Amino acid sequence: MEKFTVPCVAAIIEKITNNEKYILIQTRQKEDGAETNGMLELPDGKIREYENIFEALRREVKEETGLSITKILGEDNQISNFIKGNEVISYTPYCITQNLSGAYSIILNTFLCEAEGELLTETNESQNIHWIKIEELKKILKNNPEKIFLLHINALQKYLGI
């Protein structure tokens, strides 16, 4: 039986505290995570059938972190058309990543975001949810990239300029 790639979303959630930039990361703990559980990751998840990609991103971030997204870079630039009962949007994410082999056949749309609210420390899909300094994340990415969920590495390298 023919199988198809699953569309997903991920969020690079930024914050600045005392003139220092942080992003939100968590430890992966998915029901179907297998060997990827225990890796550092961005909040992410699957897009439901006919779900608006920006609403999917908001839902996944809320479910996994407790935070509410207040801004998604590029959302205001989306193009929308509604003709004969069909609604279509076009958008530009920060980074698109496709897994070509391995455990997951995924196309991941990663967006830059801001969020607010009470941060959870653990959910049924993630643990150790926390803000990490950009410089600390750069060190992990350079020295131990195997600790980061593979589908998030390219977007993080782009974001961090490495």
Across the structure, where does each feature detected by a protein language model lie?
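Short, charged/polar surface micro-motifs in flexible loops or helix N-caps
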Residues: 18-19, 31-32, 48, 78-81, ...
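The catalytic Nudix box helix
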Residues: 42-86
